């Protein structure tokens, strides 16, 4: 049975509509798992402030004073540093390679956590968080590019969500450990997490596309053999890679910045930027960074630390649901479901906090914030959490993938910084209800953005996606009606 959502959005509820068969080679799974362990570290450090600030601001535990303003900077400086890391990461993945850039973040991740763990003043914590954020920015840019360039189309959706799954495990580990560890011990745990990632990253190869871009055909062939299996015939794929690179070289200009603003490149860049905007302005990082405080403010009858653990568990399992569904239903259907779930729950949360502030009495509804948060996290983790990152690695053209991904990542972290740094001020100015209703209204706009502009990429090779985005191949007669400017 199929549902027609748009000309490019066909969904099968039994098997993939185009009969694609997954090809999970051990080497592809190992490559995806290796880089995804970096995402586990990212998830842990991103969630760190939620449990850590509680003990960090307790003068009986901490030998130095952490004011409310300083505490907001402990949470807010990481996305600001990630913005800088995102800008830096674009040139790095082009010159050093995707794998080498990811690997280079491992030791700084360890050092930054040790700096926080051994801190004797707020400045040391802020320096550690800044270095952490800088590495997070580089990693969040590099991971989807690496996976997009190494995984086959049949498994790119499933294995491409592994970073999100392990990132959510990192968040869950942080929540669970934070319920019985103080901020210093939690940071020591954070310093240990990058070690397995560091070891495994040494084993896997660079992406074949990067080798082709560097004119290293033989090394590209060896990388493909490693990824596809020794018995696989990689010559057709290598030939397609080299042809795609030749096409890109013919159309390229000397100035990379000018390339970004060419009409054909601006279209996928704008779509990717839009997805990142609606991802962050759904309010997700305000929820993650300030979960404990939000539950306290709501007067929830459930222990706040237990609440965060429950949210983390839901986040984890929702991502695995996404892994199962993404190559069956496609990207757009999951984005629709995600957006609708967030709109409904944010509206209800806004209503709860409005009644709490202005009446009637809702003290007997202490379970409601947790229920809404669970559904909100479930919806976000199914779609708007992982898919913007996955699609960034899919729809950006090969020739500008590094600098374009840098722009998109920096923009994402800028939005993250704005949301996390202003969330507390926003709740003061508008009330918690106003903040949640504002995020809900933005989600409504995001739903229309997905319907109108976002293409479906399920089962397509990166070369096919690029050709269609550039308009180099004819579309089906239905799609050629082109009711929307960015239709694919």
Swiss-Prot record:
Keyword Zinc applies: no
Signal peptide: none
Lipid bilayer topology: Multi-pass membrane protein
Entry's localization field: Cell membrane
TM spans (from-to): 29-49, 73-93, 106-126, 130-150, 161-181, 185-205, 269-289, 306-326, 333-353, 373-393, 403-423, 434-454
Cross-referenced SUPFAM superfamilies: MFS general substrate transporter
Keyword hit for Manganese: no
Keywords tagged on the record: Cell membrane, Glycoprotein, Membrane, Transmembrane, Transmembrane helix
Function comment: Fails to transport trehalose.
Protein name per Swiss-Prot or TrEMBL: Trehalose transporter 1-like protein
